[in-house]
A protein has these predicted regions:
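Short, charged, surface-exposed hinge/linker loops at domain edges
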Residues: 1-14, 46-82
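Structural detector for hydrophobic anchor residues on beta-strands
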Residues: 11, 24, 34-36
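Short aromatic-glycine-(Arg/Gly/Cys) micro-motifs in beta-strand/loop hairpins
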Residues: 16-29
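Generic structural motif
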Residues: 20, 31, 79-81
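Flexible, active-site-adjacent loop/turn segments at secondary-structure boundaries
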Residues: 29, 33, 64
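A short, exposed loop/beta-hairpin motif centered on an aromatic-Gly-Thr core
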Residues: 32-43
Length: 82
């Protein structure tokens, strides 16, 4: 489910070329704080995906909400005490 979430989020990524240095800037608008800036579009996509994965893991670890993307939700359930 996490892989599918990442794939769908990456489909929503927005990219632009920054006029100051002609580098590529990418972000996923639904995921606040997930952005990357690299010299090439390929590197920007790769870094953006890595940042998204780290962002997801941090939100899961801290039990923070994760926005729904294309009908996919990730919910954290409390572990029961053994």
């Amino acid at each position: 489910m996490i892989r599918e979430y990442i794939d769908r989020a990456m489909d929503q990524a927005k990219y632009e070329i920054l006029p100051e240095d002609q580098s590529y800037y990418g972000e996923i608008p639904a995921c606040q704080g997930v952005f990357a800036n690299c010299a090439t579009l390929e590197k920007c996509r790769k870094e953006l995906e890595e940042i998204l994965e780290e962002w997801l893991l941090l939100r899961i670890y801290k039990n923070l909400s994760i926005p729904e993307i294309d009908g996919i939700t990730i919910t954290i359930k409390e572990a029961s005490a053994a």
